[in-house]
Amino acid sequence: MGLRHLVLCPGSRSGPLALAAGGMARTNLLRLSTAIDERSAAFLALGFSTATGTAAAVVTTSGTAVANLLPAAVEADRSCQPLLLLTADRPYRLKDCGANQTVNQETFLSPACRWIGQGPREGLHLFSTETLESFAEEAWQRAHHPAGAVHLNLPFEEPLHLSEEEQRVIWKGWSPKIPRSAPITPTNLAMAAEGTEGVTDRAPFALDPFRPGVVIAGAWRGLSKDLFAFQQSLREWQALSGWPVLADPLSALPSDQPGLIRSWELLLAAGLLGSHEQLQVLRLGPMSASRSLEAWLKSFGDGQLLITEGDSRCLDPLGLSVQWSHGLTTWWQHHHHRWIDADAASQQATQPLLKKWQIIDRFAQDWLDQQLPLQGAITEPALARWLSRLLPAELSIMLAASSPVRDWLAYADKSLFSRRCFSFRGASGIDGTLSLSMGLAMALGPTLLVSGDLALLHDSNGWLLAHPQRPPLVVVLIDNGGGGIFEQLLVKKAPSEAFEQLFAMPQAVDPLVLAAAHNIPHRQVACLEDLPAALEWGLFQTGPVLIRVCTHRGQDSSMRQQLREGLVMHLQSISQNGHIDL
């Protein structure tokens, strides 16, 4: 089928699945990982899936183990990542009669899954070989078209544990089935998941590339195999239109993407890009984490074009767009012939806007370099500015939700786009941050996780995944004593003590002691000058490491406001001198 990674959780009812997974791992048919926490295991598998673009599987026993898979299933659903959830169950005769460890688990995950595959009620042994292979193949296709989680609930009757001799007999007579030449397609799978609502897949319309417009690139949610064609289609559209490109760090666009405006989040927050009612808008993928962008897009009114990569659910919380759900490449192939004879003179109406924004962007980036040097006390904006610059270009980055992903949106420079960048922008939770990052590192190689203290502590069981496989993960922990994001969301209107208790929720846990308890190498960095050496040390290790940096969330919140205000004053001063036109 294509399954390469499987995460196995402990259990007795899942014994037949465990023995099968072990046999396949011994013959190098898949990579087997183990995890004692099902919630963590599911996010580890999701990390494999996110990195490779193909589904990984997680196997659990029956009971509450199944409920722990829901957070990862929700994230897979919202972020369009394939994931297989295989749960062992008791036979139907043991349901609703007080039997031990027997619950109605077949319904636990249904709201977040593309498909629920239910095995025979009296036991999976009733499936013929042909039926079982067809069942597995349909599950694989359903997990990828459109991508999301699939739940296979598999009842097993006793006996559950074969002897070693019985296992040898089975393995001797088994060989992996070759997938049929005509795979199940998205069309005959009804394209969207069962129960999907809000489909807005109307016929595409053509924008006018010879009138001013802007491209908004959100997080990439397509399949890995489609990414290069997506990037090339955008290059061709931008070359034709000359439109500026405002890209999210999660957009998977390369650093040499023409028209890239890196400072757009700060410029929008400061009101420096103005309101352009006549601008056309091409939106790619889901909405970014920027509230300034949402407010700005509202000023354009309706008629915007939103293109998604196969997700036919409505992805426009503003309700202002026509949505085309079959991808940018398909849309471009449908329309590009209209402008095949266009020449450079056709761009005369669009080029002034791009040139103006590029000049403003260049001044803004130079000013940020002056304000955020690699020296002195560590601040969160400075970390966002420098971490990407200090890392090898091929190294992937995972950004925890809340503050890190927003800071990198605002303060990271163009070097961020020289690498793949991941985050939870599906359901935007902090659940499973460390575990998913372990999966990314196992699949991709050296990876950096940037996390706040609450996000890391919330998924501290992810440290258990460090052994024995020792994924090359460098964790940069921003320890600011609680939920720093709430300092930015304007909720600090309550008295200080109430704010700390109700929102920030600081925890009395030493992350270095916690790392030591899991045998994780760790160190603390006190100033920005020491950051390069700490990263070099972390990348030199053979497994996960923790680098702790302590920041002050109140001071960093004030600093963000000062940077926004200072940028406005700086650019206005330059404008008064005639160097730029605001």
UniProtKB/Swiss-Prot annotation:
Catalytic reactions on record: isochorismate + 2-oxoglutarate + H(+) = 5-enolpyruvoyl-6-hydroxy-2-succinyl-cyclohex-3-ene-1-carboxylate + CO2
Listed GO molecular functions?
2-succinyl-5-enolpyruvyl-6-hydroxy-3-cyclohexene-1-carboxylic-acid synthase activity; magnesium ion binding; manganese ion binding; thiamine pyrophosphate binding
EC number(s) for this protein? 2.2.1.9
Cofactor note as given: Binds 1 thiamine pyrophosphate per subunit.
Q: Which InterPro entries match?
A: MenaQ_synth_MenD, THDP-binding, Thiamin_PyroP_enz_TPP-bd_dom, TPP_enzyme_TPP-bd
Q: Which cofactor does it need?
A: Mg(2+); Mn(2+); thiamine diphosphate
Q: In which pathway does it act?
A: Quinol/quinone metabolism; 1,4-dihydroxy-2-naphthoate biosynthesis; 1,4-dihydroxy-2-naphthoate from chorismate: step 2/7; Cofactor biosynthesis; phylloquinone biosynthesis
Q: Which UniProt keywords apply?
A: Magnesium, Manganese, Metal-binding, Thiamine pyrophosphate, Transferase
The record ties this protein, via Pfam families, to:
TPP_enzyme_C, TPP_enzyme_N
Q: Which GO terms describe its biological process?
A: menaquinone biosynthetic process; phylloquinone biosynthetic process
Q: How does it assemble?
A: Homodimer.
Family according to the record: Belongs to the TPP enzyme family. MenD subfamily.
Function recorded in the entry? Catalyzes the thiamine diphosphate-dependent decarboxylation of 2-oxoglutarate and the subsequent addition of the resulting succinic semialdehyde-thiamine pyrophosphate anion to isochorismate to yield 2-succinyl-5-enolpyruvyl-6-hydroxy-3-cyclohexene-1-carboxylate (SEPHCHC).
Stated name of the protein: 2-succinyl-5-enolpyruvyl-6-hydroxy-3-cyclohexene-1-carboxylate synthase
Please name the source species. Prochlorococcus marinus (strain MIT 9303)
This chain is encoded by the gene named menD
